[in-house]
Design a protein with these regions (language model features):
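N-terminal intrinsically disordered/low-complexity leader segments
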Residues: 1-15
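Amphipathic alpha-helical linker/stalk segments
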Residues: 8, 66-96
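Helix-turn-helix
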Residues: 19, 23-65
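Solvent-exposed, amphipathic alpha-helical segments
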Residues: 19, 23-30, 77-81, 113, ...
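Amphipathic alpha-helical segments that line or abut small-molecule/effector binding pockets
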Residues: 22, 68, 90-108, 112-116, ...
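Short helix-capping/turn signature of helix-turn-helix
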Residues: 56, 116-123
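Amphipathic alpha-helical packing segments from all-alpha helical-bundle domains
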Residues: 72-75, 80, 106-115, 125-152
């Protein structure tokens, strides 16, 4: 497993949290959900186990926040793509589909982390809650674009 570059000692709380979330994504990609440990996350981030516990009081909280981070990243990605596509429904649909394949959100590590979470979603309703509202927004946007395409004939 790759260890991230050794970070400076003093970083903001948000930067440290993001660093730990990125390390969690890396660990999930290699080890999977059940075999990922906080120690591996700390090692991958180049931080102490204590810092992981300081920022995330449990593995469940760290994983939940990692899923929320991935979900927000994905949502911002497709929303930006649709907004940049302009007013044409055909261009918006094209942008929406292409957004799923952009390197920022479809790296092997990120896809593996998503798969790890999908495998746990049935037994962890919290994960469904974390992504459910964002998924509903995606579906609503897709339906609106398709309705606009149909209206154009």
């Amino acid at each position: 497993m790759t260890t991230l570059a050794k970070p400076p000692r003093k970083l903001s709380r948000e930067v440290r949290r993001e660093q730990l979330i990125e390390a969690t994504i890396s660990v999930l990609a290699v080890r999977g959900y059940a075999r990922a440990t906080l120690t591996e996350v700390a090692d991958t981030a180049g931080l102490s186990h204590g810092l992981v516990n300081f920022h995330f009081t449990s593995k469940d909280i760290l994983f939940s926040e990692t899923l929320a981070y991935l979900s927000e990243e994905y949502t911002q990605n497709w929303q930006r793509a649709v907004a940049l596509a302009g007013p044409s429904p055909a261009a918006q649909l094209d942008a929406l589909v292409r957004a799923d394949f952009l390197a920022e959100v479809s790296t092997p590590q990120r896809l593996a982390a998503w798969c790890a979470f999908w495998g746990e979603a049935q037994s962890r309703p919290l994960y469904q809650e974390k992504c459910g509202s964002k998924n509903a927004i995606y579906i609503e946007t897709l339906e609106q674009i398709c309705a606009a395409l149909l209206a154009e004939g």
